């Protein structure tokens, strides 16, 4: 039986994919000045399919981990609603189409998509995720590739501004994952995945999240100094990030590590979407 559309969307983590696509589209709009509709559509298609295909491969490789975790055991592969073969075929088709669309835009968009796949699958998922509590620091660079690709689609190259946007998403990825894995630390221990909060404890997860939040703020400030976002846009986007820091500090004092980390997780997601939207609007 062919996988359902719902299961395919879940395989590709469509909400997460959409958030990363927003970073790429906004990076394109910021860099283009006068956007070309055809280039925007083709670049968006390239980014969406490349991210989706990469995510699908990640789900195949992590199916055993997902089976062991309460949070993820109902995903299509561990729940056996989709075979690994079907998942690989769907992911391969999406990735190939995404990279082909990238070539049609320009070589830099293709390279960004390919690097995203290689970093996420080879470096993060295969080499580091099951071995190092610092895996997300390296894996986060995969999440930054759509922003870099979007900038490259607009400008014909990477450039320091494109690299800054990529770094912002990369550093934010550590914050995103550490806040979430602090809340679900017991799940990660059960699955044998050495996420930082699972190895060093929830308090360490909050401390690491605070350090990552400071790093995110600094990179965002550099983006402001580089002229990528206005002072008003930067100030407005920083509000949920500052609130997340306040929540994490409160958790550090009160000992409510898991609860405050989860609240901060929601706030930092708002920050990321807001920053990139304001990048364009301001």
Curated annotation (Swiss-Prot):
Keyword Oxidoreductase: no
Pathway: Porphyrin-containing compound metabolism; heme O biosynthesis; heme O from protoheme: step 1/1
EC numbers: 2.5.1.141
Lineage top rank: taxon: Archaea
Membrane topology: Multi-pass membrane protein
Transmembrane segments annotated in the record for this chain: 40-60, 87-107, 108-128, 135-157, 162-184, 204-224, 228-248, 261-281
Family the UniProt entry places it in: Belongs to the UbiA prenyltransferase family. Protoheme IX farnesyltransferase subfamily.
This protein's name: Protoheme IX farnesyltransferase
Source organism of the structure: Thermofilum pendens (strain DSM 2475 / Hrk 5)
A GO CC annotation given for this chain: plasma membrane
The keyword Transferase is annotated on this UniProt entry: yes
MF GO annotations: protoheme IX farnesyltransferase activity
Matches recorded under Pfam families: UbiA
